Amino acid sequence: MKRTYQPKKRQRSKEHGFRKRMSTSTGRNILKARRLKGRKRLTA
């Protein structure tokens, strides 16, 4: 059986990347929350 996680850099950044997060208001809220929490990495 094939594993479910087949990593792809392009797809990951397209779906969970910084620019995708910035493009929506809820995405910006996520970034804000992660900044407040003090996350080292904001996005994938």
From Swiss-Prot:
Gene3D superfamilies (alphabetical): 1.10.287.3980
GO-annotated molecular function: structural constituent of ribosome
UniProt xrefs under InterPro entries: Ribosomal_bL34 (IPR000271), Ribosomal_bL34_CS (IPR020939)
Keywords of the record: Ribonucleoprotein, Ribosomal protein
One GO term (biological process): translation
UniProt name for this protein: Large ribosomal subunit protein bL34
Organism: Alkaliphilus oremlandii (strain OhILAs)
Pfam family, one: Ribosomal_L34
Biased composition (Basic residues): 1-22, 31-44
Family listed: Belongs to the bacterial ribosomal protein bL34 family.
Lineage: Bacteria, Bacillati, Bacillota, Clostridia, Peptostreptococcales
Gene: rpmH
GO cellular component assignments: ribonucleoprotein complex; ribosome
Listed HAMAP family: Ribosomal_bL34 (MF_00391)
Organism superkingdom: Bacteria
Stretches the record annotates as Disordered: 1-44
